[in-house]
Amino acid sequence: MDDNKRPLYLPFAGPAILEAPLINKGSAFSEEERIFFNLEGLVPYAIETIEEQASRAYDQFRSFNNDLDKHIYLRNIQDTNETLFYRLVQNHISEMMPIIYTPTVGLACERFSKNYRRNRGLFISYPNKDRIDDILNNSTRQKVKIIVVTDGERILGLGDQGIGGMGIPIGKLSLYTSCGGISPAYTLPITLDVGTDNPQLLEDPMYMGWRHPRIGGEEYAEFIEAFMQAVHVRWPDTLIQFEDFAQKNAMPILERYKDRYCCFNDDIQGTAAVTVGSLLAACKAAGTELNKQRIAFLGAGSAGCGIAEAIVAQMVSEGISDEQARSQVCMVDRWGLLLDNMPNLLPFQQKLAQKCADICNWNNFSDNISLLDVVNNAKPTVLIGVSGAPGLFTEEIVRAMHSHCERPIIFPLSNPTSRVEATPKDILHWTSGQALVATGSPFEPVVVDGETYEIAQCNNSFIFPGIGLGVLASGARHVSDAMLMASSRALAECSPLAINGSGPLLPKLEDIHSVSKHIAFAVGKVAIEQGLSLPASDELLMQSIEDNFWKPEYRRYKRTSF
């Protein structure tokens, strides 16, 4: 039976119900509920439907003049009536997703302490390292199935935001629910407060976190270990998503725990999965295959290298050797093209460095080979930006790329909008509308020579909610590389441009529920095939996906005692 049709039995009444966001209905409590739960007089007389409430809330939302105020308003609804919040977002998802997440969430993180109103989630501070289990026990969510956790050190492209980074786990989990149908009762945002190296925060009298330089080394590793163990003991089947950890910690943490617990890093693996899915769709739209592409990256951090490794894996699955695939991927960072003779390459960069012998015949060879040098010599067909530095895809670079590639695939993925490597408008004008463009942040459609081009947002929200739903529905014990690859292929199968030859590269946000279910099925099926979950037929898996897909509808309440 659908949970939304079954009554929910509550052991308390009166103001306590109105203060519980997961069960509060506000003006939608029925006459019977108002009597039995001692609510008469605590809410206005009129009994409203959730759609009537959502209509009023939307009018109020539209009355705010800037996006940060809209964000604060929506968070206030979320903190008072979660069902109404998700109904409102569901009704206006294209308009509200940029408000509840990127790009607005970046500003919300920067002003977190100044705008703080009400607690959501858990803050686990290093001075309390010996009481982590007690802190987890304090959570108002006791059936936690998905955790998003950050330490606030690398928030979007904004750097160290300390506990202000909590805006990211809150926003991500809002998308797990609004896009992937995960019940908000099963979600828990967590910030690990290990100090901050941001001098502005340390000197800000309103900063609410642990006012101390960030810990590191063994202290940091032991704190993360204690946290992971405590979560596993309390909620052994919980999916843990790592979010916005600094490059020096992100990959080591993922490598340490991915085979021990059910976890993944969205910046590395989620970004890689959605990018590969978008590339597969773009290649199909251009009438080619991914293993035939030459790819240049601007940005060789953990996210960029994670994407590159996923691309290499997909190329190999399409029939070429690992060595050949790596030779077709060029990584450029602030020091230029990564080469195998560079002394300070990080471990995850080493396998992606080009061999010096392979580029000895390039023109303009120098110690620091620029992105323009790479474009002129390697002649890439795909250009991906994950640098966090705006404007680096210059007109000269894009035009040079277009001169040897009729339909260049260009993905400036850096967030927020102010950090994008080039705007879609510029890219499409420089290529006479021929480029296939996807961005990390939302952009308005672009008109070139009278033709309108919808800009695909290569946003992780197309991937991670479906992964989470697939893990929950299948009961997977780990998130494997094969499951992530399956999510990429499933996303590509939903591309309007690849399927119909017209429309955007990625689906519209209004179709996100069907996309998430499609991805969840692909992910769950691989988990079953790999023995990471109990055996189940396709029919049972689909039914489990539907059973786990929460809808923002009010339930009837009954009292358990008087």
Swiss-Prot record:
Pfam families (UniProt xref): malic, Malic_M
A GO cellular-component term linked to this record: cytosol
Catalysed conversion reaction: (S)-malate + NAD(+) = pyruvate + CO2 + NADH; oxaloacetate + H(+) = pyruvate + CO2
Cytoplasm among keywords: no
Alphabetical UniProt keywords: Metal-binding, NAD, Oxidoreductase
Binding site for a divalent metal cation: 243-244, 267
Residues annotated as binding NAD(+): 154, 267, 415
Cofactor(s) named in the record: Mg(2+); Mn(2+)
UniProt enzyme class: oxidoreductase
Alphabetized PANTHER family for the sequence: MALIC ENZYME-RELATED (PTHR23406), NAD-DEPENDENT MALIC ENZYME, MITOCHONDRIAL (PTHR23406:SF34)
Family to which the UniProt record says this protein belongs: Belongs to the malic enzymes family.
Name this polypeptide is given: NAD-dependent malic enzyme
Originating organism: Shewanella sp. (strain ANA-3)
